[in-house]
Amino acid sequence: MKVNPSVKPICDKCRVIRRHGRVMVICQDPRHKQRQG
């Protein structure tokens, strides 16, 4: 899980979602997981 000030989809499998007011990227590739913070 990377924590970045700006989250962007890396590949075409990445999905940008909102959970509890946080913007997150979920993907089949676990290395692409990101959270804004």
Swiss-Prot record:
<comment type="similarity">
    <text>Belongs to the bacterial ribosomal protein bL36 family.</text>
</comment>
<dbReference type="GO" id="GO:0003735">
    <property type="term" value="F:structural constituent of ribosome"/>
</dbReference>
<keyword id="KW-0687">Ribonucleoprotein</keyword>
<dbReference type="GO" id="GO:1990904">
    <property type="term" value="C:ribonucleoprotein complex"/>
</dbReference>
<dbReference type="InterPro" id="IPR000473">
    <property type="entry name" value="Ribosomal_bL36"/>
</dbReference>
<dbReference type="GO" id="GO:0006412">
    <property type="term" value="P:translation"/>
</dbReference>
<dbReference type="Pfam" id="PF00444">
    <property type="entry name" value="Ribosomal_L36"/>
</dbReference>
<protein>
    <recommendedName>
        <fullName>Large ribosomal subunit protein bL36</fullName>
    </recommendedName>
</protein>
<dbReference type="InterPro" id="IPR035977">
    <property type="entry name" value="Ribosomal_bL36_sp"/>
</dbReference>
<keyword id="KW-0689">Ribosomal protein</keyword>
<dbReference type="GO" id="GO:0005840">
    <property type="term" value="C:ribosome"/>
</dbReference>
<dbReference type="GO" id="GO:0005737">
    <property type="term" value="C:cytoplasm"/>
</dbReference>
